[in-house]
Swiss-Prot record:
GO cellular component: ribonucleoprotein complex; ribosome
Gene symbol of the encoding locus: rplW
Family: Belongs to the universal ribosomal protein uL23 family.
Cross-referenced SUPFAM superfamilies: Ribosomal proteins S24e, L23 and L15e
Keyword terms, alphabetized: Ribonucleoprotein, Ribosomal protein, RNA-binding, rRNA-binding
BP GO terms, sorted: translation
Protein name per its UniProtKB record: Large ribosomal subunit protein uL23
Pfam families associated with the record: Ribosomal_L23
Subunit text: Part of the 50S ribosomal subunit. Contacts protein L29, and trigger factor when it is bound to the ribosome.
GO molecular-function terms, A-Z: rRNA binding; structural constituent of ribosome
UniProt source species: Caldicellulosiruptor saccharolyticus (strain ATCC 43494 / DSM 8903 / Tp8T 6331)
Its job: One of the early assembly proteins it binds 23S rRNA. One of the proteins that surrounds the polypeptide exit tunnel on the outside of the ribosome. Forms the main docking site for trigger factor binding to the ribosome.
């Protein structure tokens, strides 16, 4: 898979933004990607050094619209920690 296919989008929440000073960034990733592929994709796309990757599968939730009930899609979340000597990801710096 290409790095652009692995990293789908950044997760912008209050909790993920509070982890940025610790050099931890949160992304939605392809469900088939493993930690090694995620690490290589982040390093290639953003030009940084990754120290550690945590992944978690987010289960679908039940949602209702009127009388119709459905489910959201299941997706995979990755939290990436950069090394101390690595530069920060510029996209997230503009959000702080």
């Amino acid at each position: 898979m290409l790095p652009e296919e692995i990293i789908k989008r950044p997760i912008i929440t209050e909790k993920s933004m509070s982890m940025i000073p610790q050099k931890k960034y949160t992304f939605e990733v392809d469900r088939r990607a493993n930690k090694i592929e995620i690490k290589k994709a982040v390093e290639q796309l953003f030009g940084v050094e990754v120290e550690k990757v945590w992944t978690m599968n987010v289960k679908p939730k039940r949602k209702r619209v009127g009388r119709f009930e459905g489910r959201t899609k299941a997706w995979k979340k990755a939290i990436v920690k950069l090394t101390d000597k690595s530069k920060t990801i510029e996209f997230f710096d503009s959000l702080i």
